[in-house]
A protein has these predicted regions:
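Conserved SAM-binding loop of SAM-dependent methyltransferases across substrates and taxa
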Residues: 1-7, 73-74
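Short hydrophobic alpha-helical segments of the AMP-binding
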Residues: 3, 27, 99
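Short beta-strand element of Class I
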Residues: 7-13, 82
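Conserved beta-strand segments of alpha/beta enzyme cores
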Residues: 9, 38-40, 105-108
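S-adenosyl-L-methionine
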Residues: 13-65
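C-terminal substrate-binding/active-site "lid" region of AdoMet-derived donor-dependent transferases
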Residues: 66-136
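C-terminal lobe and adjacent flexible extensions of AdoMet/dcAdoMet transferase-like proteins
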Residues: 140-145
Length: 145
């Protein structure tokens, strides 16, 4: 949404028509009808290939992002950035391995979690319980090919 708000053109791949329609409705609700001029959701499977070229950025939220890396290599422009959300560190490690074997560099993985804090007067500490779901974000940059 932030990129659309800033004026970027966004192309998404979705294998389910109902999810594609939901995505468009969400964009319209958040940014208005005009934003849909720059937002395109294609009914395609990224595992089978990516036809478009010269993407600046690619964000992956799917079970096996490492399977898309060879396609991303041809779809991203030189210096383009790829990012994947993975719920497990094993997935993040497999994704990193695929990136290393396909010309990507500056690879970094970070864990994302949410922890609340107790702040009352001078008593400042993390809450005793943390009910959280962690996730891992791995990003890299495509080197010149």
């Amino acid at each position: 949404m932030t990129m659309l708000r800033a004026g970027a053109n966004i192309t998404g791949y979705e294998i389910r028509e109902d999810f594609a329609e939901r995505a468009k409705k969400n964009v319209k609700a958040a940014l208005g009808e005009k934003a849909l001029d720059r937002y395109d959701v294609l009914i395609r499977d990224a595992y089978e290939g990516i036809e478009e070229k010269d993407f600046d950025r690619m964000v992956l939220d799917l079970p096996e992002p490492w399977s898309v890396v060879p396609h991303a290599k041809t779809a991203l422009r030189s210096g383009g950035i790829i990012l994947a959300y993975t719920p497990s560190i094993v997935q993040a490690a497999k994704f990193k391995e695929a990136l290393e074997g396909n010309g990507f560099a500056l690879i970094e993985t970070m864990e994302v979690m949410n922890r609340t804090w107790h702040i009352e007067g001078q008593a400042v500490r993390p809450d005793h319980r943390m009910v959280a779901h962690t996730a891992f974000l791995t990003h890299a940059r495509l080197l010149s090919t």
